[in-house]
């Protein structure tokens, strides 16, 4: 305890000052961990605060080490045998190490975290997305964030967004609707401007090897800057895809988050894996491996294939698995997990994530995410067969269903349809007009959002 050695040796003023400083620091830490705990996450996404905290921790560590050394000096007898001096010096070194290393680790972690934060999230002035901190959502009842899973494998040119989900979040309650579009959606209209001028009757792709699927839009924009004039490289794809999906769903798209699917495996590994229930055998990889049914802890590679595999399945079934995987990761990314793998998670996030969410919006999003985790209703609606057919989609119906989903009572949800996730049929599902093998008519497609809790075992 700071100051005790000074009191013992009669240095009462210095001892009082050190003790008061020690008590003040301890009280501040205790208050932060208890009374102001909810404010910590708000502060933890502000780079300026993190920079000051890192510097403060360095200063604290230096002062603490100096206090330990000085306390030993004033308590040490003037005459001591050499062996006693050596033993005392060793004890002081151990004490300095004991107090200095945790503080140094905390300062380093804060620096690493700030570096990752500023690398992933640019300021509003940098990306042209100014945020009013008094009204971060501009009075909007919902904030709509496009979640993209990008596949940039070595055998592909550029990025293919094989996973596309619009998360529409109520800014008051945190109730969330996940609207998922299949990667192979065709004949969709392009947004007004150069893109529609290029494709007046819907997107047809870039040459004979590209049939004009929704997952091609991102890379098409990157390779053809004239369809998104004035937008820099690596931002053209997100901008055109946001505008395209906004037109398909009839909903505003505020921001996007892109996750590289292969870097995603690094994040899962840094978390120590993700626990999930596998409901059926899932073949994966090139060596004939299979994820067996049951409750399992998947490593990064297994989690990646759980969300990507289409063998003996379909795009639509894996879309349902992807939602369950997203839910499991969000629930299991607890503070203890984050702290124990901090450096690995930060490095993986820098390699894996891209977004146009400005830094200034992060405090409001953290507050909103707490509402989502604290009992908000999360529902999912997938525009897949037999509800919507990718090769001949009814865009008027898509827009109506999307509007109904975000405006409906979040507690009036339907049960998951048999054979798939939120409208996703199993691999052997019949067409809507054909009878099942037993002669009965197949169930009608579910046109209402399904509770993610009910859909994911």
PLM ranges: what are they?
Residues 1-28, 32-35:
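Membrane-anchoring hydrophobic segments
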Residues 5-13, 64-86:
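Cytoplasmic membrane-interface segments at the C-terminal ends of transmembrane helices
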Residues 15, 47-57, 82-89:
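Membrane-water interface of alpha-helical transmembrane segments
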Residues 21-75:
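Membrane-embedded alpha-helical segments of integral membrane proteins
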Residues 81-112:
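Internal/C-terminal transmembrane anchor helices
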Residues 107-457:
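Non-catalytic, solvent-exposed segments at the cell envelope interface
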């Amino acid at each position: 305890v700071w100051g005790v050695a000074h009191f013992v040796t009669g240095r009462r003023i210095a001892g009082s000052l050190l003790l008061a400083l020690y008590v003040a620091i301890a009280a501040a830490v205790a208050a932060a961990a208890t009374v102001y705990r909810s404010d910590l996450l708000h502060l933890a996404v502000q780079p300026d605060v993190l920079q000051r905290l890192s510097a403060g921790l360095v200063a604290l560590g230096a002062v603490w080490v100096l206090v330990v050394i000085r306390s030993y000096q004033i308590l040490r007898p003037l005459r001591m045998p050499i062996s006693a001096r050596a033993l005392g010096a060793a004890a002081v070194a151990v004490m300095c190490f004991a107090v200095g290393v945790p503080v140094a680790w905390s300062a380093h972690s804060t620096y690493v975290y700030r570096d990752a934060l500023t690398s992933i999230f640019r300021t509003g002035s940098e990306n042209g997305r100014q945020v009013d901190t008094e009204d971060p959502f501009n009075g909007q009842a919902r904030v709509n964030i496009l979640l993209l899973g990008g596949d940039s494998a070595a055998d592909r040119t550029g990025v293919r967004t094989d996973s596309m989900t619009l998360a529409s979040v109520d800014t008051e309650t945190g109730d969330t609707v996940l609207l998922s579009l299949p990667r192979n959606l065709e004949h969709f209209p392009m947004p007004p401007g150069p893109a529609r001028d290029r494709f007046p009757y819907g997107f047809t792709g870039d040459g004979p090897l590209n049939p004009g699927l929704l997952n091609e839009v991102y890379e098409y924009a990157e390779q053809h800057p004239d369809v998104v004039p004035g937008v820099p490289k690596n931002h053209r794809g997100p901008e055109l895809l946001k505008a395209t999906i906004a037109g398909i769903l009839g909903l505003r798209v505020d921001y996007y988050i892109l996750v590289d699917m292969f870097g995603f495996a690094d994040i899962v590994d840094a978390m120590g894996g993700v626990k999930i229930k596998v409901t059926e055998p899932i073949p994966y990889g090139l060596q004939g491996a299979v994820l067996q049914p049951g409750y399992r802890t998947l490593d990064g590679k297994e989690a990646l294939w759980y969300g990507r595999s289409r063998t003996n399945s379909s795009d639509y079934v894996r879309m349902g698995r992807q939602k369950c995987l997203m839910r499991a990761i969000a629930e299991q990314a607890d503070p203890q997990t984050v702290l124990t793998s901090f450096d690995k998670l930060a490095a993986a996030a820098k390699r894996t994530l891209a977004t146009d969410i400005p830094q200034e919006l992060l405090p409001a999003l953290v507050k909103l995410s707490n509402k989502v985790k604290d009992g908000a209703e999360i529902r999912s609606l997938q525009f897949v067969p037999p509800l919507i057919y990718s090769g001949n989609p009814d865009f008027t119906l898509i827009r109506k269903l999307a509007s109904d989903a975000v405006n409906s009572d979040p507690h009036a949800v339907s049960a998951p349809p048999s054979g798939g996730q939120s409208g996703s049929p199993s691999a052997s599902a019949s067409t809507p007009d054909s009878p099942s093998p037993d002669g009965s008519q197949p169930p009608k497609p579910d046109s209402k959002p399904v509770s993610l809790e009910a859909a994911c075992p």
